[in-house]
Amino acid sequence: MATSVDNRHYPTMNGVAHAFKPPLVPSPRSFDRHRHQNQTLDVILTETKIVKETEVITTVVDSYDDSSSDDEDESHNRNVPYYKELVKKSNSDLEPSILDPRDESTADSWIQRNSSMLRLTGKHPFNAEAPLPRLMHHGFITPVPLHYVRNHGAVPKANWSDWSIEITGLVKRPAKFTMEELISEFPSREFPVTLVCAGNRRKEQNMVKQTIGFNWGSAGVSTSLWKGIPLSEILRRCGIYSRRGGALNVCFEGAEDLPGGGGSKYGTSIKKEMAMDPARDIILAYMQNGELLTPDHGFPVRVIVPGFIGGRMVKWLKRIIVTPQESDSYYHYKDNRVLPSLVDAELANSEAWWYKPEYIINELNINSVITTPGHAEILPINAFTTQKPYTLKGYAYSGGGKKVTRVEVTLDGGDTWSVCELDHQEKPNKYGKFWCWCFWSLDVEVLDLLSAKDVAVRAWDESFNTQPDKLIWNLMGMMNNCWFRIRTNVCKPHRGEIGIVFEHPTRPGNQSGGWMAKERQLEISSESNNTLKKSVSSPFMNTASKMYSISEVRKHNTADSAWIIVHGHIYDCTRFLKDHPGGTDSILINAGTDCTEEFEAIHSDKAKKLLEDYRIGELITTGYDSSPNVSVHGASNFGPLLAPIKELTPQKNIALVNPREKIPVRLIEKTSISHDVRKFRFALPSEDQQLGLPVGKHVFVCANINDKLCLRAYTPTSAIDAVGHIDLVVKVYFKDVHPRFPNGGLMSQHLDSLPIGSMIDIKGPLGHIEYKGKGNFLVSGKPKFAKKLAMLAGGTGITPIYQIIQSILSDPEDETEMYVVYANRTEDDILVREELEGWASKHKERLKIWYVVEIAKEGWSYSTGFITEAVLREHIPEGLEGESLALACGPPPMIQFALQPNLEKMGYNVKEDLLIF
């Protein structure tokens, strides 16, 4: 890759040397996140003592207040007071940003962010969009914390007082301006601009064939009121050369250090004619929605190029270089291109497609999206709803300053179209340019929606550009602007009435759902498809291995045939189910899916080597064809239309509906039971939800720790029928306590560090043991029964035992007898002791408890040492077939050396009668 612009040297022109001088290193005193993220400019100037004299302060504030007559006229023409009112309205119901626990242990841990933002690239770097309903709720102006973010790496820690921008290259008067000089010496402009990531709606492309980009949904778009200095004024001050003098491009370079091309800054460029065109309103912005920029959006200064993709708007701007050539930044060439559909990554690199100028993206294309109805929204069909129309809503935008002139909606696949009502809240600039999105709406009859199989939207701009019907795939997944379609299906909600449920094409990030995901599941298998493509995870097809499509793998998701994908390889784990230490559910929960991340999170190197014995082939993908119509709708009459309605039977609202989906939960209470034991209470997504965890099963707690997914199994201690929350009792294994484990417990320490309000994910249920009540168990699907239970636990292994005790005692008709032997290192290590002894005291005939500790205090009245045959014979029943079962959860040495041999001596068949969690 070419060297970065840092290393460029320019010839002397008119006696001025233009070799690059490195910019000053910003002060290590970083911009204080707590005090300065949202302060107004005059406060910052005062506190950082940028200016010393009253006269200078007055000049700065006057410039900030737009006191010049030209600026006043411009502000009046742009309707700035109206936009400022919209900013206030938009921010009125916005919760404060927080230091998100997900940013701990990253370089961005100092940045406050809105916790509702959907992260698209994991923990770091921060790339995020707002939930679509949330974005639309705030209206024309997007609150800054909900504005989409595209970061390539860590956010630079900037200081207003020592930040400067260097203007160099083909200019007569190279200069370096501080922030104070920029705002005091140049006029400013303030107007709204809609920013759009070129990857907006990319996940739809990834559903067809994986691109090299991550999964943007349809909220990679936001609108703010931006204030800054016109770029043309700065270049004019510095004496930019003419085209004849070689000044053809204006390059921008940011401050962040990135890995691309072996190490570089983020940089890009635009043509000189664009940079100098006053009609284009290009500014160096230092304010957003009336406040200084926040770190994620480029504090202290960034480029705003209205009507262009976000990739041209360099944040944390440090240098402007006027050159004959385009920017030679790695990111200028290896990003923001729309290559022909035939070009894959290998071809793009080998044939230098990245460097062909005709494929660079600058101006946005025309686009529109349906935002109402939302995904999974249900419209009831009844006497009330059918008496009034339903209002479809959405947004539309175009690029280059072109006005969106028409939005149309079709309910019949494009045979007929209805023209929507447009809401343009923006006044054009004096050159007639429009830089913002507009909103559209259309009233439709509910019965027309009932007979439609889908709803699609397309927009037109003043140049009569419109959106294509079908998706056009490209390697980077950019500029996707095909008709936005939502599918409709008839359902029957639990109240018994008919309803229409709406499905958007995708959901952002790694969230499951959307009709395109369903279509992908219905792809024909690789054996009958002639159009085989290379897998993203296996760039070169291995002809020695059998190749399987994702749709073929998805069929193998049962105990009879359990396949998984790890790093693009296919493994048949069916014969390993019965031997898996974590039980069959741990495999079945991921059967038929790509579980690379989960597998890496919980398996050792030994397990990874063992997996190779089960490898059967490699993953491919198939060419995309539209699947058969799976809608229940027909358009002719309502007789066949309603025939296949799916009955949604009344059921409890439970969180763990799909064991493969992660459920976000929020920490609402943390109690210290002892120096190293905590009780955590997490709120479920809905206040009226039950967890839905069968007795005997457990959940995975999922967290990103040190940039890696970490999964740990926990059994909740909350009641099975608890509503709105889940309780976990966790022993915290601190680092530098146990010599064998100097780093301590990764997950337990992470949970202990979480502040109230933090979010984690859980998934489940999993586990091979389920207690069905009245002595009945299902073990890997096979029934077992006992009147008496020997319940043997070590350390934190008490939690699944606790769960079963709780369930049995909550049922007055369950007469199962329970005999608990609970081993720990010391008396202080005994978990949930108060609850256990309270139950034992209240239910003396049904529950008996005995403790064993390795180290005892004086006066200890239970056993000391380890679990022995004598302890077991005295405190649990003999092993009698059909009468007794042993349940065990604890360290492997306890089970292998203390329990199994001694239980055998007591008549237990350890293969059949010992149930190990």
From Swiss-Prot:
Residues 63-74 have a biased composition (Acidic residues). CDD domains: cyt_b5_reduct_like, eukary_NR_Moco. Residues 660-772 form the FAD-binding FR-type domain. One of its GO terms (biological process) is nitrate assimilation. Residues 545-620 form the Cytochrome b5 heme-binding domain. It catalyses: nitrite + NAD(+) + H2O = nitrate + NADH + H(+). It comes from the Eukaryota. Root, leaf, and shoot. Its cofactor is FAD; heme; Mo-molybdopterin. Binds 1 FAD per subunit. GO terms for molecular function: FAD binding; heme binding; molybdenum ion binding; molybdopterin cofactor binding; nitrate reductase (NADH) activity; nitrate reductase (NADPH) activity; nitrate reductase activity. Transmembrane segments: none annotated. Its EC number is 1.7.1.1. GO terms for cellular component: cytosol. Residues 62-81 are annotated as: Disordered. InterPro entries: Cbr1-like_FAD-bd_dom, Cyt_B5-like_heme/steroid-bd, Cyt_B5-like_heme/steroid_sf, Cyt_B5_heme-BS, FAD-bd_FR_type, Flavoprot_Pyr_Nucl_cyt_Rdtase, FNR_nucleotide-bd, Ig_E-set. FAD binds at residues 712-715, 729-734, 741, 746-748, 799. Heme binds at H580, H603. Keywords: Disulfide bond, FAD, Flavoprotein, Heme, Herbicide resistance, Iron, Metal-binding, Molybdenum, NAD, Nitrate assimilation, Oxidoreductase. Pfam families: Cyt-b5, FAD_binding_6, Mo-co_dimer, NAD_binding_1, Oxidored_molyb. Mo-molybdopterin binds at C197. Belongs to the nitrate reductase family. When mutated confers resistance to the herbicide chlorate. Nitrate reductase is a key enzyme involved in the first step of nitrate assimilation in plants, fungi and bacteria. This is Nitrate reductase [NADH] 1. It comes from Arabidopsis thaliana (Mouse-ear cress). The gene is NIA1.
